[in-house]
Curated annotation (Swiss-Prot):
InterPro entries: Integrin_alpha_N, Tip. This is T-cell immunomodulatory protein. Glycans are attached at N52, N70, N181. It comes from Macaca fascicularis. Its main location: secreted. It is a single-pass type I membrane protein. It is found in: Secreted; Cell membrane. Belongs to the TIP family. The chain crosses the membrane at residues 266-286. One of its GO terms (cellular component) is extracellular region. The keyword Cell membrane applies. Interacts with RUVBL1, RUVBL2 and alpha-tubulin. It comes from the Eukaryota. The keyword Cytoplasm does not apply.
Length: 311
């Protein structure tokens, strides 16, 4: 079970209870898990606000999605593990809301925390950079609305804004050759300070293989029977895909724009490629220089031979 109390060094931490008052002194925030794959392993992690049950302190904590190791989660085979010793998060006292956001647009989810300020009506925003470094890959997908404010002009594809409700799913092959798939929904909640990501970051783990298939579906009007779904193939890892479902009822006409996300892996690959080219050029230069010296030596020997023959 997720909604349970957690114990750490004799201290009991639990979710902040929702207080329904007639005249609340502060904004009541219901229990909310903000989901995001911070380590790009393909399993959704969570950020939560926990309160010390024996005191008044409440903090933001990271819950990592890990394999199950007890009997309470055998059927799900996964569980959330609380990270208690994250120094930067622990320094933020009286946290109210914590969520994920890709601040640097590099596909790695950072953390944004809203906490109480020095006065009663004052709040502070904290941003924490995710320094996670691993040989992991991702694909970032955002599905737009494909709408115009008025009639859409001809030969111009309308972008619109990100819409709630789309469903994204991919299939690929992992590093061991096994079939792997993953899925996510876009903007499934809008109320109660949901603060969900405006896009979907799907972790691929350590598999650098292309995505064999990526499916995108959008909600259909009530009474319509046709499925609004389109498929794209051979999607490059560490890329961002912007899907424009226009027109909505003709999935074959939907378009997608693919943007590559620069990363350290690309830089290291370029450096390695340049190094190999320089090494090959150095070998070619040395061989050419040796061959030139050998040719000069042969020419001198030929000149001496003709000179002695003339004598």
């Amino acid at each position: 079970p997720v909604l349970q109390d957690f114990s750490n060094k004799g201290t009991l931490w639990g979710f902040v209870p929702f207080v329904d008052e007639q005249q609340p002194t502060e904004i009541p925030i219901p229990i909310t898990l903000h989901i995001g794959d911070y380590n790009m392993d393909g399993y959704p992690d969570a950020l939560v606000i926990l309160k010390n049950t024996s005191g008044s302190n409440q903090q933001a904590f990271l819950l990592e999605n890990v394999p199950c190791n007890n009997a309470s989660c055998e059927e799900a085979r996964r569980m959330f593990k609380v990270y208690w010793e994250l120094t930067d998060l622990n320094q933020i006292k009286d946290a109210m809301v914590a969520t994920f956001f890709d601040i640097y647009e590099d596909g790695i989810l950072d953390i944004v925390v809203l906490s109480k300020g020095y006065t009663k009506n004052d709040f502070a925003i904290h941003t924490l950079k995710n320094n996670f470094e691993a040989d992991a890959y991702f694909v970032k997908v955002i599905v737009l609305s494909g709408l115009c404010s008025n009639d859409c002009p001809r030969k111009i594809t309308p972008f619109g804004v990100n819409q709630p409700g789309p469903y994204i799913m991919y299939t690929t092959v992992d590093a061991n050759g096994y079939l792997k798939n993953g899925s996510a929904g876009q903007l499934s909640q809008s109320a109660h300070l949901a603060l969900q990501l405006p896009y979907n970051v799907l972790g691929l783990g350590r598999s650098a293989n292309f995505l064999d298939h990526l499916y995108v579906g959008i909600p259909r009007p009530s009474g319509e029977k046709s499925i609004r779904k389109q498929e794209w193939t051979a999607i490059i890892p560490n890329s961002q895909l912007i899907v424009i479902p226009y027109p909505h009822n003709v999935p074959r006409s939907w378009s997608a724009k693919l943007y590559l996300t620069p990363s350290n892996i690309v830089l290291l690959t370029a450096i390695a490629l340049i190094g190999v080219c320089v090494f090959i050029l150095a070998i070619i230069g040395i061989l050419h220089w040796q061959e030139k010296k050998a040719d000069d030596r042969e020419k001198r020997q030929e000149a001496h031979r003709f000179h002695f023959d003339a004598m």
